[in-house]
Swiss-Prot record:
List of residues binding Mg(2+) 1: 415, 422
GO biological process, any: lysyl-tRNA aminoacylation
Matching Pfam families: tRNA-synt_2 (PF00152), tRNA_anti-codon (PF01336)
Keyword annotations of the record: Aminoacyl-tRNA synthetase, ATP-binding, Cytoplasm, Ligase, Magnesium, Metal-binding, Nucleotide-binding, Protein biosynthesis
Cofactor dependence: Mg(2+)
Binding site for Mg(2+) 2: 422
Localisation per UniProt entry: Cytoplasm
Catalytic activity annotation: tRNA(Lys) + L-lysine + ATP = L-lysyl-tRNA(Lys) + AMP + diphosphate
EC number in record: 6.1.1.6
Free-text cofactor note: Binds 3 Mg(2+) ions per subunit.
Encoding gene (name): lysS
Protein name: Lysine--tRNA ligase
Assembly information from the UniProt record: Homodimer.
Organism annotation: Xanthomonas campestris pv. campestris (strain B100)
A GO cellular component entry from the record: cytosol
Lineage: Bacteria, Pseudomonadati, Pseudomonadota, Gammaproteobacteria, Lysobacterales
């Protein structure tokens, strides 16, 4: 027996409305016209509104003289029956348009219209006119019902007031909440703009496996699955990094992928177990050039999609036009914690005392690098409102980044923070196979010590590095968080069409 999603209990009045609509559908079935599929539209509502926006030019007389015949289809969002004439509004993907309906023109179709419900999907054919109030309207010469809606839409004045219902029933949210629809249209434009930006700079888009033999590319807990035919445990990828860098070894010097990652971790306003990442690699680039690239692609995407580089996000006004600040992690920690000296930043015992003073919980396996990161996350991260690159992370928490030539224990790595949220992570890639093998081994020891997010040892990746990887810079940008920034959304669920939710009871 297959599991089924439980049907939510409905209020009695809603059940009665559904029963009425089912009866209407039954009548349509009896007439053999329940779900017709032979209508071809010629126009969209939004296009007509844009083309004939000038009311002074396109008067009712001018529109009727133009004799433009249009065929539209959409969802019935409002109706006002007034005896021999009525008005209605339909909505398609582009917007809304008013319909002017006359009984003496439509005949039986007008009679049928009186029994239709808001939410039904209809088709209309006719010419254009403008009402006395100046509203562009389709003067219907033919009208048909294409799809009977069995469930009533939410009240037009209150919409979907239950946020959880908006996420669970995104299909309803998109119908009744124009702002939600606009977020997802912008999301598509943002991703398209990023692709165009990278393609114009000779980056090659690639696809790498979604199921891995060995989880790697990020410190995160993976989802596991099983391949029955091979009798093999596999992992949904936490990041595509190691596969993309194998391609750099193979001579594809500029590669990128925009795709899903999966991490078996907590759910919050910033985290969803399944999320979209841009990850790219460029041979012969350092983390300085990758920071330049990150700054420019975000700025250009904002300008291209929004027409501005100034955005408001979660109560903060963000300006993406000025150069993003670049700040070493240890310097940022010392700035916000004057009690911590430069020497303390690499002294495990000193950092343990500071963590205890700051009431930061730590594990016995943490070295000074992990402790420094914990202090940064607790005391600095939330203060970074304007775009800031936090650079030079400790080796301990950067197992794939190139070690600094001048600062022992640190790496050539950055993370980008805006309004206290991490949006990007990048570094000069570690291309020394022996150093990488040692770092993998340290991660294995950390995993044995209880760190379930530590990486596994990937022998094939070490073999790839042994063939030689050019000096390379890499970058990962969280697309979901970038969309949050550019749409002013405060929860990651607002920018995911179908965020993960607990099953309904």
């Amino acid at each position: 027996m297959t599991e089924q999603t439980p049907t939510p209990q409905l209020p009695a009045d809603e059940n009665s409305l559904i029963a009425e609509r089912r009866a209407k559908l039954g009548a349509l079935r009896g007439q053999g016209i329940a779900y017709p599929n032979d209508f071809v539209r010629t126009h969209f509502a939004g296009d007509l509104q844009a083309e004939f926006a000038e009311a002074e030019t396109w008067t009712a007389e001018a529109l009727e003289a133009a004799d433009r015949s249009v065929k539209l289809a959409g969802r019935l969002m409002a109706k006002r029956v007034m005896g021999k004439a009525s008005f209605a509004q339909i909505q398609d993907e582009s917007g809304r348009v008013q319909l002017f309906l006359q009984g003496n023109v439509l005949g039986d179709a007008y009679t049928a219209f009186k029994g239709w419900d808001v939410g039904d999907i209809v088709a209309v054919e006719g010419g254009l006119t403008r009402t006395k109030t100046g509203e562009l309207s389709v003067k219907a010469s033919a009208l048909r019902l294409l799809t009977k809606s069995l469930r009533p839409l939410p009240d037009k004045w209150h919409g979907l007031s239950d946020v959880e219902q908006r996420y669970r029933q995104r299909y309803v949210d998109l119908i009744v909440t124009p702002e939600a629809r606009e977020v997802f249209i912008k999301r598509s434009k943002i991703i398209r703009a990023i692709r165009a930006w990278l393609d114009a700079r000779r980056f090659l888009e690639v696809e790498t496996p979604m199921m891995h033999y060995i989880p790697g590319g990020a410190t995160a807990k993976p989802f596991t699955t099983h391949h029955n035919a091979l009798d093999l445990d596999l992992y949904l990828r936490v990041a595509p990094e190691l596969y993309l860098k194998r391609l750099v070894v193979g001579g594809l010097e500029r590669v990128y992928e925009i795709n899903r990652n999966f991490r078996n971790e907590g759910v919050s306003t910033r985290h969803n177990p399944e999320f979209t990442m841009l990850e790219l690699y460029e041979a012969y680039a350092t983390y300085h050039e990758i920071m330049d690239l990150t700054e420019q692609v975000i700025r250009d995407t904002a300008q291209g999609v929004l027409g501005t580089t100034q955005v408001s996000w979660d109560g903060a006004d963000i300006d993406l036009a000025p150069a993003f600040r670049r700040w070493r992690m240890d310097e940022a920690v010392r700035h916000h914690n004057p009690e911590i000296s430069a020497a303390d930043c690499t002294d495990r015992a000193a950092l343990l005392r500071h963590c205890e003073r700051l009431k930061i919980k730590v594990k016995p396996s943490y070295g000074w690098g992990k402790l420094l990161l914990e202090i940064f996350e607790a005391t600095v991260e939330h203060t970074l409102v304007q775009p800031t690159f936090i650079t030079d992370h400790p080796v301990e928490v950067s197992p794939l980044a190139r070690a600094s030539d001048t600062e022992p224990g640190y790496t050539d790595r950055f993370e980008l923070f805006i309004n206290g949220k991490e949006l990007a992570n990048g570094f000069s890639e570690l291309n020394d196979p022996e150093d990488q093998a040692a770092r993998f081994q340290a991660q294995v020891q950390a995993k044995d010590g209880g760190d379930d997010e530590a990486m596994h040892y990937d022998a094939d990746y070490i073999r790839a590095l042994e063939y030689g990887m050019a000096p390379t810079g890499g970058l990962g940008i969280g697309i979901d968080r970038l969309v949050m920034l550019l749409t002013g959304s405060t929860s990651i669920r607002d920018v995911l069409l179908f965020p993960y939710m607990r099953p309904e009871a």
